[in-house]
């Protein structure tokens, strides 16, 4: 997808059209203009397609006054209204057409769904522009390609394995050519017909550890690329999974060694079945990680004495115990707070799964079966806060994601400036309206799939249904005691490339390298 930036942004990308169940795929342009009032205008000009050989010249779809809601990373555009579609062959029938539009503006990327109801033609047209990118491609491990590793000494000496499309292991690794060949010669990835209970798919992935005599090679898969650079498996400066969106290398399937993700999921779910080849009490666990980052170079694990400042959030479980012959679904929550100080924006995610949480410490024949990995996006209500003129903060009692309506008596005037709804979705979009003693909160999940509406009935008087808390400014005091340059100068935030010393409120000190 490309965007031309000026007074407006024009995006070129795939356009999927569904007309009463019949589909058409083509490429088109959509233009997004920001209005002076902060709303947006969407233009899909000269919209036409061929339906069963019959040309359909619909016309110009121009949607004005589309409200935008930010989640701090991206913008949601959402509106439901009637519009006139002009410039086509059916202007007289399309003077007032109901449309339901929801979309997301990302950094150089746009995605939207537009439902167009043409009642006079008895047609419902569903238009999808762009790519959703809220889930990983081939996360069910249904399709595979052949990965090949070649001896650096003899181009005719090769080994192959089945790697899941969009995923990678040792045969497609970077690093020392000789070590890549040694690590990749014996396959560790296998397509498998043993699927998790209730799956609609036919395949899963099996990872298998291999005894290389000098060390155990853990069965490992990643959305990025493996690097094999040292005989010592635990040398994280040389052996790691990595991704970098500026890298143009492609795998045997023609895909890059990175996964795009602009969103902020709340958890990663994955079905696993884990069996050790030989019981190992000191190193008994498999591992699964997902690290959201800004798309610049990132290694997992990080090199020694390095802290990455391009991380947005992570989901990590390094204690996946044996499940025997049983499939088990794991839910691994994402955490974001520890990385907020870096101010990075989500563009990519590096997901890695391995038969052992410790490099080279597994046993020969460890098996990790993987199926149906997904990201979870919440859209529930977690809290409602109201702030008095003196800074005292109140929370509405009993708020939870299931209860949709609340009532509170408040001893001060409630406005849009002192009323806030907090979602249980990290990247959820929250829009608030407040009029005539009723506040309405519409919460949409970051993947745009779920919307919940909550209401708060507000009365003026002595406090009822609310609880006073501490002053908001005190509650939000920084957890970091100080950030210093290597020269000892204190700074407010890590903004420029360089080495920093970070001291937390408990006196702990760490070095942080911003590239």
Language model: regions and residue ranges:
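Edge beta-strand at a domain terminus
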Residues: 6-14, 24-28, 60-72, 105, ...
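Short, solvent-exposed loop/hinge segments that bridge or flank secondary-structure elements
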Residues: 14-40, 91-94, 151-182
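Predominantly extracellular/secreted and cell-surface proteins with exposed
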Residues: 26-28, 32-105
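Extended, low-complexity, turn-rich repeat/linker tracts enriched in Gly/Pro/Ser/Thr and Asp/Glu
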Residues: 50-52, 274-284, 296-299
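Beta-sheet ligand-binding and adhesion/scaffold domains
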Residues: 76-133, 227-239
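Aromatic (Trp/Tyr/Phe) and Gly/Pro-enriched flexible surface segments
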Residues: 130-265, 269, 283-294, 298-331, ...
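Beta-rich interaction/scaffold domains
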Residues: 378-465
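C-terminal outer-membrane/trafficking sorting elements
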Residues: 462-515
């Amino acid at each position: 997808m490309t965007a031309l930036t000026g007074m407006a942004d024009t995006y070129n990308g795939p356009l999927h059209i569904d007309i009463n169940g019949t589909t058409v795929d083509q490429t088109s342009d959509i233009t997004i203009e920001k209005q002076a009032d902060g709303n947006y205008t969407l233009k899909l000009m000269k919209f036409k397609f061929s339906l069963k050989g019959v040309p359909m010249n619909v016309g110009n779809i121009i949607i004005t006054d589309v409200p935008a809601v930010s989640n701090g990373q991206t913008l949601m555009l959402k509106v439901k209204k009637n519009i006139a579609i002009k410039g086509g062959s059916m202007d007289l029938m399309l003077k007032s057409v109901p449309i339901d539009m929801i979309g997301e503006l990302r950094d150089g990327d746009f995605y939207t769904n537009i439902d167009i109801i043409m009642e006079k033609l008895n047609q419902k047209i569903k238009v999808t522009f762009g790519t959703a990118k809220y889930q990983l491609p081939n996360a069910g491990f249904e399709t595979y390609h052949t990965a090949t590793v070649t001896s650096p000494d003899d181009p005719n000496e090769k080994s192959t394995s089945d790697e899941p499309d969009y995923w990678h292991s040792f045969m497609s690794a970077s690093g020392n050519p000789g070590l890549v060949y040694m690590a990749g010669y014996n396959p560790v990835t296998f397509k498998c017909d043993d699927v998790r209970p209730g799956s609609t798919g036919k395949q899963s992935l099996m990872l298998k550890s291999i005894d290389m005599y000098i060390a155990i090679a853990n069965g490992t898969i990643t959305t990025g690329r493996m690097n094999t650079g040292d005989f010592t498996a635990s040398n994280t400066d040389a052996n790691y999974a990595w991704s970098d969106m500026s890298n143009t290398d492609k795998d045997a399937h023609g895909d890059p060694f990175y996964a795009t993700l602009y969103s902020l999921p709340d958890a990663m779910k994955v079905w696993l079945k884990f069996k050790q080849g030989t019981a190992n009490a000191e190193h008994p666990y498999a591992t699964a990680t997902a690290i959201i980052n800004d798309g610049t170079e990132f290694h997992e694990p990080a090199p020694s004495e390095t802290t990455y400042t391009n991380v947005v959030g992570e989901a990590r479980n390094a204690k996946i115990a044996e499940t025997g012959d049983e499939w088990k679904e794991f839910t691994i929550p994402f955490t974001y707070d520890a990385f907020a100080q870096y101010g990075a924006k989500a563009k990519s995610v590096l997901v890695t799964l391995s038969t052992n949480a410790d490099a080279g410490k597994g046993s020969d024949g460890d098996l990790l079966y993987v199926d149906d990995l997904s990201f979870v996006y919440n859209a529930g209500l977690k809290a409602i806060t109201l702030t008095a003129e003196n800074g005292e903060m109140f929370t509405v009692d009993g708020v939870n994601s299931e209860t949709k309506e609340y009532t509170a008596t408040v001893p001060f005037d409630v406005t849009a400036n002192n009323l806030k709804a907090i979602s249980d979705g990290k990247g959820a979009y929250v829009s608030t309206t407040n009029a005539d003693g009723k506040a309405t909160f519409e919460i949409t999940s970051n993947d745009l799939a779920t919307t919940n509406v909550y209401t708060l009935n507000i009365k003026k008087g002595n406090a009822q249904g609310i609880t006073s808390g501490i002053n908001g400014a005190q509650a939000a005091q920084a957890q970091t005691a100080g950030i210093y340059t290597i020269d000892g100068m204190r700074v407010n935030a890590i903004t420029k490339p360089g080495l920093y010393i970070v001291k937390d409120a408990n006196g702990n000190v760490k070095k942080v390298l911003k590239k």
